């Protein structure tokens, strides 16, 4: 997993609520046996239906931040949705709320999800309609800076530490293997 500390990027405005995992990556693209190759299918059905869909706009092709509406990532628990987003270059999603399962899948795969109040998210989304608008995400300080304003966000301290150091669950366990072995030995008596 790639470490994340600070990011400055333009943002993709997607002011839709209840974006479910099937919208993010349709089920017919889940036939692979590897974790790779999902990014090209991100929002496939929405891109096909609407040529003006924001993910069809080349002005946002290098954007690493996505701004969305309430309840992002709802629906099934497919981890493929997170893989598709990260493989498409998305490193941060800002929304008023996220599905719990999606939130956990994102944290385990290095995708930073930031919840801000709905009015703030809508304001940022409106500003992101200009592809030149950029913002800075500072995970260490837990701030979003945009257009002269700074917004603070909460983030789980354990997940924050793992993301800053680039540790997925397995790497974290390996890093603490000696402590785990000592504990196991002490339990055996």
From Swiss-Prot:
Q: In which pathway does it act?
A: Amino-acid biosynthesis; L-leucine biosynthesis; L-leucine from 3-methyl-2-oxobutanoate: step 2/4
* Uppermost EC category: lyase
Molecular functions per Gene Ontology: 3-isopropylmalate dehydratase activity
Q: Which UniProt keywords apply?
A: Amino-acid biosynthesis, Branched-chain amino acid biosynthesis, Leucine biosynthesis, Lyase
Q: Which reaction does it catalyse?
A: (2R,3S)-3-isopropylmalate = (2S)-2-isopropylmalate
What does the record list as GO biological process? L-leucine biosynthetic process
Quote the Gene3D superfamilies the UniProt record gives: Aconitase, domain 4
Q: What is its EC number?
A: 4.2.1.33
Annotated Pfam families: Aconitase_C
According to its record, what are the GO cellular component terms?
3-isopropylmalate dehydratase complex
Cysteine disulfide partners in this protein: none
Highest rank taxon of the organism: Bacteria
Q: Which NCBIfam families match?
A: leuD, PRK01641.1
Q: Which PANTHER family match?
A: 3-ISOPROPYLMALATE DEHYDRATASE SMALL SUBUNIT (PTHR43345:SF5), 3-ISOPROPYLMALATE DEHYDRATASE SMALL SUBUNIT 2-RELATED-RELATED (PTHR43345)
Self-association or partners: how does it assemble?
Heterodimer of LeuC and LeuD.
Q: Which HAMAP family does the record match to this protein?
A: LeuD_type1
Reported function: Catalyzes the isomerization between 2-isopropylmalate and 3-isopropylmalate, via the formation of 2-isopropylmaleate.
Q: So what family is this one in?
A: Belongs to the LeuD family. LeuD type 1 subfamily.
- Its protein name is 3-isopropylmalate dehydratase small subunit
Q: Which species is this record about?
A: Francisella tularensis subsp. holarctica (strain LVS)
The encoding gene? leuD
